[in-house]
Design a protein with these regions (language model features):
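Generic L/I/V-rich hydrophobic alpha-helical segments across diverse proteins
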Residues: 32-35, 42, 56, 63, ...
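Residue-level detector of solvent-exposed, low-hydrophobicity positions
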Residues: 17, 27-29, 46-48, 90, ...
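N-terminal acidic leader/helix
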Residues: 5-42
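Secondary-structure edge/capping motif, primarily at the C-terminal ends of alpha-helices
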Residues: 17, 42-50, 77, 81
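Long acidic/polar interaction regions in large eukaryotic complex-forming proteins
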Residues: 2-11, 93-101
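Amphipathic alpha-helical binding modules
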Residues: 60-102
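Generic signature of intrinsically disordered, low-complexity segments enriched in small/polar residues
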Residues: 8, 23, 42-44, 86-91, ...
Length: 102
């Protein structure tokens, strides 16, 4: 499955989002990780029959499409919010967000 973001980049977004209580990017990142796990499971699942193989391929194909959509979603979110696309660092404006909300 093609990946735009590696696990370290996604984890960095999750870590920063949790520290600064900015849950939306973290939720998208967690969904991406879950889709990767589902895909890997389907690719390694036992195929005891042609029907099993078809079921697993169908789920894997749908998961791959969903993964692509969610990675594009993450890319757009990071662009909209102004995250650094090289270091995956949260912008200062978002870091101050929780303080204003209190």
């Amino acid at each position: 499955m093609k990946e735009q973001f590696d696990a370290a980049q996604i984890s960095k977004v999750i870590d920063q989002a949790l520290v600064y209580q900015c849950a939306c990017p973290a939720q998208v990142c967690r969904a991406i990780f879950e889709l990767r796990e589902l895909y890997e499971y389907q690719m390694s699942c036992a195929n005891d029959s042609a029907n099993d193989a078809l079921v697993h391929r169908t789920i894997a194909a749908a998961t791959e499409k969903s993964h692509e959509v969610m990675e594009e979603c993450l890319k757009k979110i990071l662009e909209i919010e102004g995250w650094d696309q090289v270091t995956f660092t949260m912008p200062q404006a978002l870091k101050k967000k929780p303080a204003r909300a209190l």
